[in-house]
């Protein structure tokens, strides 16, 4: 696995209001041979927190991709990366089956810097650990060789 990629995975979060597990898009960053971090991406279309009035506040916690970043990284719609909430997972080789595409190192450097800035200022949410079993339960791709 490269340093960072876009992954599509079905994940059930405690904050989810309904029981339906939906596919989510993440930027997955390989920290080392044992750990990966997931940062959730989000469409900015028609969302109140991304409108002109709220954008400056939202930018404190999200990296909102420029049109150039959207094009360079294969996103189809305006997208932001949630840098306030980090999901951690132990690395396992089957994880690569959820990979969708690569992202540029320039984007990853910006995102990591933003995550670190948010954390150093105590503005982050508590980290969430995702287990292999949780991913396996909702992502049948992981079970097949």
Walk through the language-model features, giving the residues of each.
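Compact nucleic-acid interaction/catalytic patches
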Residues: 17-23, 28-68
């Amino acid at each position: 696995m490269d340093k960072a990629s876009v992954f599509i995975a079905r994940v059930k979060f405690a904050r989810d209001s309904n029981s339906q597990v939906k596919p989510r898009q993440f930027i997955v960053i390989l920290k080392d041979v044992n750990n990966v971090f997931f940062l959730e991406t989000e469409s900015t279309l028609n969302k109140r927190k991304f409108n002109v009035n709220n954008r400056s506040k939202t930018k404190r916690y999200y990296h909102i991709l420029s049109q150039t970043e959207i094009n360079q990284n294969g996103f189809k719609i305006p997208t932001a990366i949630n840098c306030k909430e980090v999901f951690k997972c132990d690395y396992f080789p089957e994880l690569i089956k959820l990979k969708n595409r690569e992202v540029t190192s320039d984007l990853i450097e910006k995102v990591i810097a933003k995550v670190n800035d948010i954390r150093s200022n105590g503005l982050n949410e508590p980290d969430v650990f995702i287990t292999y079993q949780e991913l396996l339960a909702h992502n049948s791709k992981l079970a097949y060789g």
